[in-house]
Amino acid sequence: MEQSFIMIKPDGVQRGLIGDIISRFEKKGFYLRGMKFMNVERSFAQQHYADLSDKPFFPGLVEYIISGPVVAMVWEGKDVVATGRRIIGATRPWEAAPGTIRADYAVEVGRNVIHGSDSVDNGKKEIALWFPEGLAEWRSNLHPWIYES
């Protein structure tokens, strides 16, 4: 099954949004396969956001990610990357659809609460970076109540 990397950013952690965000993914029927509560080192943040290193906002983004703890997670399920992006909402909170995480909780693009993989391939890269030790193997007993096969 498809996997996606999801990170609750420092503002989401500080604002006490961890439980609600996890609940949204669980209620959709996705499986939590890995989770870490951690502080991010500068070099690690730079590596994670390397594709944005030429952007003018890159230094501020790195400072933001290292400013406090994050919750790094791997979610698994059918079409979890695309569906996860819909649950999260547009990068710019004012463009996010009502009911999405960013529409509900974010005001500024620089404090937009959450990161989610934007493609299956990027998800694989992010998961390998953040979870080099691997993931928990398990399947919920609810699987047949969520998926047809």
From Swiss-Prot:
It catalyses: a 2'-deoxyribonucleoside 5'-diphosphate + ATP = a 2'-deoxyribonucleoside 5'-triphosphate + ADP; a ribonucleoside 5'-diphosphate + ATP = a ribonucleoside 5'-triphosphate + ADP. The keyword Heme does not apply. Its EC number is 2.7.4.6. The active site is at H115 (pros-phosphohistidine intermediate). Gene3D superfamilies: Nucleoside diphosphate kinase-like domain. Induction: By salicylic acid, benzo (1,2,3) thiadiazole-7-carbothioc acid S-methyl ester, jasmonic acid, and abscisic acid. ATP binds at K9, F57, R85, T91, R102, N112. Keywords: ATP-binding, Kinase, Magnesium, Metal-binding, Nucleotide metabolism, Nucleotide-binding, Phosphoprotein, Transferase. It is an enzyme of class 2 (transferase). CDD domains: NDPk_I. One of its GO terms (biological process) is CTP biosynthetic process. GO terms for molecular function: ATP binding; metal ion binding; nucleoside diphosphate kinase activity. HAMAP family: NDP_kinase (MF_00451). Belongs to the NDK family. NCBIfam families: PRK00668.1 (NF001908). Homohexamer. This is Nucleoside diphosphate kinase 1. The gene is NDKR.
